[in-house]
């Protein structure tokens, strides 16, 4: 038993080291993540605007940091801004800066994020939460590479590479008139879709290993083994909170562990398993796109229900819809 644990953990460590050496904190060897990392490499050396799309907790900031670190701007620190973290008035001042006396309480000049990010990259997280009234100013600085501080008419030139991220459906927001179409097209130059953790189960053992050792080191614990059954249990879970949720679960496990073997303790209600074996298997030479299209046709375009495509594929309805969206499959065109 002990020798098997050692062998399994040595294999995980070797895979982990190979990944970490190329992309720092990004962990993943699945096909889904390999596709993401290829896109990161392709776009990093340009100055093109990047839009990172993905659910909460998928690691969008890590992707932004990787793009910056691989770019020619990596000699300067990447500047970060969360558009959902403050009200519109403060957000405008934080982005563009202000002059003394520009508004009540502006007792001194302030340099904004666009100015701080000159010759570097600016990461705008949760860009879908930017108020409509601020969006024209963001569009202008992207188009003209110039702006004014609040309370000033002086144009300031800036050389900034923008990386934006959101967990919201910007296309739908444009339709609903909650997001400007011209800004959307300006941001959507090079979109990168970050898959949720449930679509990359092969990466879970690597992530568990990385989080366990990182957290154990931080807490001064010595944990050098992770049982195979623990990895299987974690791999079967759905993870609605994605990588962030997994990291929190591992932190709890490290806290509760006594000894050098990770002890996983989960309340029963937390264990929501993903389907283990699909009811319909791919035919020889059939890829994921072809499999889903075939099953949708056989199901007459029905996704949910006992005879729906999701049930036949052994997937949750939301998971199948997410994959259909990623692969560009429209069920209405198949019936």
Sequence positions of predicted segments:
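Conserved post-Walker A coupling segment in P-loop NTPases
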Residues: 25, 38-105, 115-131, 196-201, ...
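Bacterial C-terminal helix-turn-helix
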Residues: 248, 280-335
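Conserved RecA-like P-loop NTPase ATPase core
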Residues: 12, 36, 58, 81, ...
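Nucleotide-binding/hydrolysis machinery
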Residues: 3, 71-76, 135, 151-161, ...
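Substrate-gripping "pore-loop 1 plus following alpha2 helix"
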Residues: 106-110, 136-156, 165
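The cytosolic transmitter module of two-component sensor histidine kinases
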Residues: 22-23, 29-33, 135, 201, ...
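Flexible nucleotide-interacting loop at or near the entrance of a catalytic core
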Residues: 1-53, 269
């Amino acid at each position: 038993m002990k020798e098997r644990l050692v062998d399994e953990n040595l294999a995980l460590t070797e895979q982990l080291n190979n990944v970490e050496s190329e992309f720092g904190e990004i962990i993943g060897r699945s096909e889904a993540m390999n596709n993401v990392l290829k896109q990161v490499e392709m776009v990093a050396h340009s100055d093109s605007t990047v839009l990172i799309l993905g659910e909460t907790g998928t690691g969008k900031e890590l992707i932004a940091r990787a793009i910056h670190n691989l770019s020619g701007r990596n000699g300067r620190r990447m500047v970060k801004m969360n558009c959902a973290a403050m009200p519109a008035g403060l957000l405008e001042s934080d982005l563009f800066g202000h002059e003394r006396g520009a508004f009540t309480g502006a007792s001194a000049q302030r340099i904004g994020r666009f100015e701080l990010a000159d010759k570097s990259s600016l990461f705008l997280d949760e860009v879908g939460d930017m108020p409509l009234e601020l969006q024209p100013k963001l569009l202008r600085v992207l188009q003209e590479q110039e702006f004014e501080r609040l309370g000033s008419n002086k144009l300031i030139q800036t050389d900034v590479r923008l990386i934006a991220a959101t967990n919201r459906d910007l296309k739908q927001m444009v339709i609903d008139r909650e997001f400007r179409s011209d800004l959307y097209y300006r941001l959507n130059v090079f979109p990168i879709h970050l898959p949720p953790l449930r679509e990359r189960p092969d990466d879970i053992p690597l992530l568990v290993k990385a989080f366990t050792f990182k957290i154990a080191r931080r807490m001064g614990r010595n944990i050098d083994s992770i049982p195979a059954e623990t990895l299987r249990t974690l791999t079967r879970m759905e993870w609605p909170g994605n990588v962030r949720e997994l990291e929190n679960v591992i932190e709890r496990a490290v806290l509760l562990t006594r000894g050098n073997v990770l002890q996983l303790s989960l309340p029963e209600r937390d264990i929501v398993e993903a389907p283990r074996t699909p009811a319909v298997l791919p035919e020889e030479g059939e890829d994921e796109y072809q499999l889903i299209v075939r099953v949708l046709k056989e199901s007459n375009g029905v996704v949910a229900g006992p005879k729906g495509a999701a049930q036949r594929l052994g997937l949750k309805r939301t998971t199948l819809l997410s994959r259909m969206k990623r692969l560009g499959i429209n069920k209405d065109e198949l019936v």
